[in-house]
């Protein structure tokens, strides 16, 4: 959340300093970064899987309008049509359970978000931890959701990451290997010019917040560069 990741308004944190330097050095375009939680109470808790699945609806109906109606963005309006027209200027990413939410966002919010950054977590749409147990079915589910909205591989870019010592490595890698069998939709490349998806694995990377910062640092320039 904003308090745990950015240390609140006016505060400082490693991630905040990192992003500021990236913008200052020209590694990425200036932007607005919002760090919400999917929990429905300040104390957290609840059914993670159900809360994750419900988040995309809250994102479109509540979160984005609350932010973009108060700030200068590419959205001329914050209704669904306005958000759809400005989808090229919006990205979503998350670590661990946030990565599972990122895959739900890809399924439900492709109309409103073009770029995705799942970090150390597979897609749970078919079943919890389904990226590993049901990799093929998971990829076919993702493809079906894209095609139903009328999009092609040219309409999105996914930069997925994890580490070799991360507990999410096997599940995420199984899902990526299944995706490679469908290059008509998931064309693997190093950037937007060469593909619709990139999978970056950090040797020795573990399931900790410090490695999450490393992933963010390497992904953001691939979405918007000067």
Give the location of each predicted region.
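Non-catalytic cap/lid and distal C-terminal segments of serine-dependent acyl enzymes
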Residues: 1-226
């Amino acid at each position: 959340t904003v308090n745990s990741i950015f240390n609140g308004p006016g505060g400082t944190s490693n991630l905040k300093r990192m992003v500021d330097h990236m913008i200052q050095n020209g590694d990425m375009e200036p932007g607005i970064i919002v760090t919400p939680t999917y929990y429905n109470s300040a104390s957290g808790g609840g059914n993670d899987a159900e809360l994750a699945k419900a988040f995309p609806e809250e994102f479109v109906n509540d979160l984005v309008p609350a932010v973009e109606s108060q700030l200068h963005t590419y959205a001329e309006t914050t209704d669904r049509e306005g958000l759809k027209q400005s989808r090229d200027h919006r990205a979503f990413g998350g670590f661990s359970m946030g990565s599972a939410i990122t895959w739900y966002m890809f399924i439900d919010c492709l109309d409103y978000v073009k770029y995705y950054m799942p970090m150390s977590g597979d897609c749970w749409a078919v079943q919890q931890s389904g990226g590993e147990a049901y990799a093929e079915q998971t990829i076919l589910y993702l493809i079906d959701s894209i095609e139903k909205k009328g999009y092609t591989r040219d309409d999105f870019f996914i930069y997925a990451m994890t580490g070799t010592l991360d507990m999410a490595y096997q599940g995420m890698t199984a899902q990526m290997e299944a995706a490679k069998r469908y290059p008509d939709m998931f064309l693997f490349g190093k950037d937007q010019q060469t593909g619709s998806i990139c999978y970056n694995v950090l040797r020795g990377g573990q399931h900790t917040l410090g490695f999450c910062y490393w992933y963010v640092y390497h992904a953001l320039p691939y979405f918007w560069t000067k």
